[in-house]
Amino acid sequence: MLKAVIIDTSAVARGLLNTVLLDGGYDVVGQTHTCASGLALLIKHHPHIVCIAREQIENGEDVVREIKTNWPKTLIFMVSSEFDAATVQAAHAMGVNGFIVKPFKADTVLNTIRNTVIAMVKRQRAALAKEAGAAAPADDGAPAAG
């Protein structure tokens, strides 16, 4: 089961997203209203997924960098009621993996997370296959000496 942490100043938004994630089979190991306490939850639980309100990211861009540095495999989802192209581009450049739109629609939230997880796994497998291919000795077609 994938573990998740929610960071949002709105208790209502945290509660709704918590319900969506729990109903979707995720283990919400913590939720908080500040990035500082959110980072403490990451240290304690090492979640696979972090959902962070847009305001939290925009007020403290270092939080995304810190998560990417210390938990590089953790997927970061920006949560907001609106996204424009500039925001999405800036968020991607910071390392945000996906976007969750308020008001929450359970199917959309769960599909967004699932599709992002699948894409990440595919990228990791491709990278491993590429590494394995580069590390494999070249076969020149000559018979083995023996």
Write out the residue ranges for each language-model feature:
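Alpha4 helix (beta4-alpha4-beta5 surface) of REC/receiver domains from two-component response regulators
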Residues: D62, F83-G98
